[in-house]
Amino acid sequence: NECIRKWLSCVDRKNDCCEGLECYKRRHSFEVCVPIPGFCLVKWKQCDGRERDCCPGLECWKRSGNKSSVCAPIT
């Protein structure tokens, strides 16, 4: 089962949000995966669709071929 990405519904799947996200019930709306405050993706963690979630000093690096993007040191 793939993890649920940021801002997508996590109704009935509260524990399936991707790393650094938590299921949050929005007022007048359904539950969605939202970023945990202060959380960031460390070096070499996958950052597809989460380009701004890499820790300070890292940037989301698109690897060649069909590989997923990862947080890598800013060169």
UniProtKB/Swiss-Prot annotation:
GO molecular function: ion channel regulator activity; toxin activity
Region spans: 2 X approximate repeats with cysteine pattern C-C-CC-C-C: 3-71
Predominant location: secreted
Tissue expression summary: Expressed by the venom gland.
Record-linked SUPFAM superfamilies: omega toxin-like (SSF57059)
The organism's place on the tree of life at top rank: Eukaryota
Disulfide-linked positions: C3-C18, C10-C23, C17-C33, C40-C55, C47-C60, C54-C71
Subcellular location(s) of the protein: Secreted
UniProt Domain repeat ranges: 3-33, 40-71
Keyword Disulfide bond: yes
GO cellular component, one term: extracellular region
Function: This toxin potently and selectively inhibits ASIC1a, an isoform of the gene ASIC1. It incompletely inhibits ASIC1a activation in a pH-independent and slowly reversible manner. This toxin acts by binding to and stabilizing the closed state of the channel, thereby impeding the transition into a conducting state. In vivo, this toxin protects the brain from neuronal injury when administered up to 8 hours after stroke onset.
Protein family: Belongs to the psalmotoxin-1 family. Double-knot toxin subfamily.
Domain commentary: The presence of a 'disulfide through disulfide knot' structurally defines this protein as a knottin. This toxin contains 2 'disulfide through disulfide knots' that are separated by a short linker.
Protein name per Swiss-Prot or TrEMBL: Pi-hexatoxin-Hi1b
Phylogenetic lineage: Eukaryota, Metazoa, Ecdysozoa, Arthropoda, Chelicerata
